[in-house]
Amino acid sequence: MSTLTHFNAKGEAHMVDVGDKSVTHRVAVAEGHITMEPETLALIRSGTHKKGDVLGIARVAGIMASKKTSELVPLCHPISLTHVEVELSTADSPPSVHCRVTAETRGQTGVEMEALTAVQVALLTVYDMCKAVDRFMTMGGVRLVHKSGGKSGTWDLKGSG
């Protein structure tokens, strides 16, 4: 197993030095879901929620969150994102909203944290907009499913997609 990179020889937290890394095209894909009561899902699908377009607002929230990741995660590098796509879909069994985010950059460090942050905030936005009608919503399954670029090459979670 590799060692933790965010600690120095004294065991103190530090931001990893990426200055000597090559600038490469990097991609990360993350996903997660929020389960809910069937009536809540019907409200989202119908577009009649009194707060507005739940999925549209969650999509924008995810994009905005990806751009703020380094402000939220203390040792995360601020990076220049070149593309962020937030895909939201619904399912009947179990009643849920699935979120899949693709984030891209050309840089010296990966873009996984931005993709993961976008998923979390998009799902939190669904929760926030629907909590008045459903306190039983549960978020889960947030994970990285693809990473490419950089010296570690391409990694894919088996069975994802």
Curated annotation (Swiss-Prot):
Keywords: Lyase, Molybdenum cofactor biosynthesis. One of its GO terms (molecular function) is cyclic pyranopterin monophosphate synthase activity. It catalyses: (8S)-3',8-cyclo-7,8-dihydroguanosine 5'-triphosphate = cyclic pyranopterin phosphate + diphosphate. Gene3D superfamilies: Molybdopterin cofactor biosynthesis C (MoaC) domain. It is an enzyme of class 4 (lyase). The keyword Cytoplasm does not apply. It holds the Pfam family MoaC. Its EC number is 4.6.1.17. InterPro entries: MoaC, MoaC_bact/euk, MoaC_sf, MoCo_biosynth_MoaA/MoaC, Mopterin_CF_biosynth-C_dom. GO terms for biological process: Mo-molybdopterin cofactor biosynthetic process. Homohexamer; trimer of dimers. HAMAP family: MoaC_B. Catalyzes the conversion of (8S)-3',8-cyclo-7,8-dihydroguanosine 5'-triphosphate to cyclic pyranopterin monophosphate (cPMP). Belongs to the MoaC family. PANTHER family: MOLYBDOPTERIN COFACTOR SYNTHESIS PROTEIN A. This is Cyclic pyranopterin monophosphate synthase. It comes from Thioalkalivibrio sulfidiphilus (strain HL-EbGR7).
